């Protein structure tokens, strides 16, 4: 009985001591630790060579990578998104067009649309300011640090949240700094 067990376990032991499977070796060389850096340019093997960039292309790239362009882009995007969000929240709010002097009167379409427009514009301005502040500070922090990682968004989130919160006092500024930094870290973790 013991010999049968020893005989049955010998092939299993020999199988585990064998070399790893071929596809495991192939995977290690393609995507694993043994991967080699690419030595040849794609154009040298018959690929489509890319022409050198002209001065105009370089100038446009520099302009689009500048902090000012990123801040303007975030400002416009925040304005559009904030306006849409404001109109949406006004649309589902039951108090839009409500007159406290006459609570039983049904508001007219003009009053409802006026309130929706006011709320949309208010949200649009706030989102635009926050987007521009965050984008500009993140770009400046990234330029100063010389790195593009998650710490940039956390630092710029703290600066932006603190600047917004300091209007209400030091305690609100500290809470705004921590809250916006945590939110930025969570978003950056989720997106990367």
Swiss-Prot record:
Component of the TIM22 complex, whose core is composed of TIMM22, associated with peripheral protein FXC1/TIMM10B and the 70 kDa heterohexamer. In most cases, the 70 kDa complex is composed of TIMM9 and TIMM10 (TIMM10A or TIMM10B). A small fraction of the 70 kDa complex is composed of TIMM8 (TIMM8A/DDP1 or TIMM8B/DDP2) and TIMM13. The TIM22 complex also contains AGK and TIMM29. Interacts directly with TIMM9, TIMM10A and FXC1/TIMM10B. Interacts (when oxidized) with TIMM29; interaction is direct. Essential core component of the TIM22 complex, a complex that mediates the import and insertion of multi-pass transmembrane proteins into the mitochondrial inner membrane. In the TIM22 complex, it constitutes the voltage-activated and signal-gated channel. Forms a twin-pore translocase that uses the membrane potential as external driving force in 2 voltage-dependent steps. One of its GO terms (biological process) is protein insertion into mitochondrial inner membrane. This is Mitochondrial import inner membrane translocase subunit Tim22. It is a multi-pass membrane protein. Disulfide bonds join 67-139, 158-177. Coiled coil: none annotated. Disulfide bonds promote efficient assembly of the TIM22 complex. It is found in: Mitochondrion inner membrane. GO terms for molecular function: mitochondrion targeting sequence binding; protein transmembrane transporter activity; protein transporter activity. The keyword Phosphoprotein does not apply.
